[in-house]
């Protein structure tokens, strides 16, 4: 990081990195790193893939459900021309989500949330009806909220906890981890931002017990790692859950891995995407954040 990078370039790099990382990681989403290694060695390119067993073979570079969420937030921000709240993004859902999206570019629980969004339920209450309050569904897609609050970490935190209520319960674990994404992006847009300044902002603005304690533990535990092969082995003893819905997609795991990659690779977007894609488990979401 650092150097003479314009704010426009930072915006572009953030969104491009999330899109490309998601598209590359979607190919091997849910795989073990041993399976990735056996088939690709190091996966470092865009390939076709299928999701949801629906017969749609997506062309290389096609994004997935997380980026669809992000696009809706971007659209709401563009249409308002300012920071957005949960109601603003709900209106974007109602205007732009197509009925055929369910099972194609969105998770099953999102169809339920959309149906409720069409009622009189306040936008801030919708997330109460999602069964998966710790998921990374918002943490991996909330980049635009950090960007519209460029340089303002407090504003980013406030808006993450506001808009995120569309997906998860107020102040819940998933939203507290999404604050990491928003605050980090807001901090990274500052002039002369560095990896250390971004990490410092995360530690200053994120929940001390629910978030910072785990991040600090894993940053220290993986400090010796020099590449993604060392990093993924280091995570094995901590993040290894199977046998339950979305077992690989909880926000604490995905965000922590992304932050450790960011630190290890000194904020290099391309290298971070490749590392995340080859880490195994929820590869597309890790790549979107890293």
Regions found by a protein language model. Name each.
Residues 1-290:
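Structured, active/binding-site neighborhoods that engage oxygen-rich ligands
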């Amino acid at each position: 990081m650092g150097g003479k990078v314009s704010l426009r370039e930072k915006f572009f790099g953030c969104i491009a990195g999330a899109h490309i990382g998601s598209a590359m990681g979607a190919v091997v989403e849910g795989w073990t790193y041993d399976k990735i290694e056996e088939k690709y060695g190091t996966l470092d390119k865009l390939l076709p893939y299928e999701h949801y067993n629906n017969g749609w073979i997506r062309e290389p570079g096609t994004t997935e459900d997380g980026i669809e969420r992000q696009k809706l937030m971007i659209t709401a921000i563009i249409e308002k021309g300012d920071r957005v709240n949960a109601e603003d993004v709900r209106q974007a859902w109602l205007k732009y989500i197509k009925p055929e999206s369910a099972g194609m570019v969105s998770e099953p629980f999102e169809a339920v949330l959309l149906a409720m969004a069409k009622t009189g339920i306040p936008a801030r209450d919708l997330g109460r009806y999602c069964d998966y309050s710790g998921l990374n569904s918002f943490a991996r897609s909330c980049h635009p909220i950090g960007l519209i609050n460029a340089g303002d970490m407090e504003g980013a935190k406030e808006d993450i906890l506001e808009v995120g209520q569309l997906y998860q319960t107020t102040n819940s674990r998933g939203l507290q981890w999404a604050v990491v994404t928003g605050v980090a992006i807001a901090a990274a847009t500052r002039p002369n931002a560095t990896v250390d300044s971004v990490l410092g902002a995360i530690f200053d603005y994120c929940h001390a017990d629910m978030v910072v304690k785990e991040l600090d533990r894993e940053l220290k535990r993986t400090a010796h790692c020099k590449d993604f092969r060392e990093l993924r082995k280091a995570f094995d003893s901590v993040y290894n859950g199977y046998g339950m819905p979305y077992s690989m997609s909880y926000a604490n795991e995905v965000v922590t891995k992304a932050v450790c990659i960011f630190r290890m690779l000194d904020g290099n977007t391309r290298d971070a995407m490749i590392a995340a894609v080859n880490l195994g488990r929820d590869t597309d979401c890790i790549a979107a954040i890293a």
